[in-house]
Curated annotation (Swiss-Prot):
Belongs to the eukaryotic ribosomal protein eS25 family. PANTHER family: 40S RIBOSOMAL PROTEIN S25 (PTHR12850). InterPro entries: Ribosomal_eS25. Residues 1-13 have a biased composition (Basic and acidic residues). Keywords: Ribonucleoprotein, Ribosomal protein. One of its GO terms (cellular component) is ribonucleoprotein complex. The keyword Cell inner membrane does not apply. Coiled coil: none annotated. It comes from the Eukaryota. This is Small ribosomal subunit protein eS25. Residues 25-34 have a biased composition (Basic residues).
Length: 123
């Protein structure tokens, strides 16, 4: 007579074998379509309307950087830098910080300018 098989042990082995092979093939990840940016068609030179807008609106901005001006007026960054230098030289905007890579301006208020003059006069 053949030896008895342990049915309890076989059932555990069978469960382990089923669990290991039960996953099947994993689904292949689909490549997502990359985000497409719209091409910026910014002005290289000022036209009359944009130049007027520069002198009217930009001095009233609280934070003035070449990137902000470029984005709002739809002009190139190099043109925005040159325009901000011009506005600063005319005293329409005030320099906050100057760095080789980033220049930050703010609106020139008459109150802050007079306070600076008074403080310098006091010292």
């Amino acid at each position: 007579m053949p030896p008895k098989k342990d049915t309890k042990g076989d059932s555990k082995k069978g469960q382990k074998a089923k669990a290991g092979s039960g996953g099947g093939k994993a689904k292949k990840k689909k490549w997502s379509k990359g985000k497409v940016r719209d091409k910026l068609n910014n002005l290289v030179l000022f036209d009359k309307a944009t130049y007027d807008k520069l002198y009217k609106e930009v001095p009233s901005y609280k934070l003035i950087t070449p990137s902000v001006v470029s984005e709002r007026l739809k002009i190139r960054g190099s043109l925005a830098r040159a325009a901000l230098k011009e506005l600063h030289s005319k005293g329409m905007i005030k320099l906050v910080s100057k760095h080789s890579a980033q220049v930050i301006y703010t609106r020139a208020t008459k109150d802050t300018d007079s306070k600076i003059v008074l403080r310098r006069g006091h010292q």
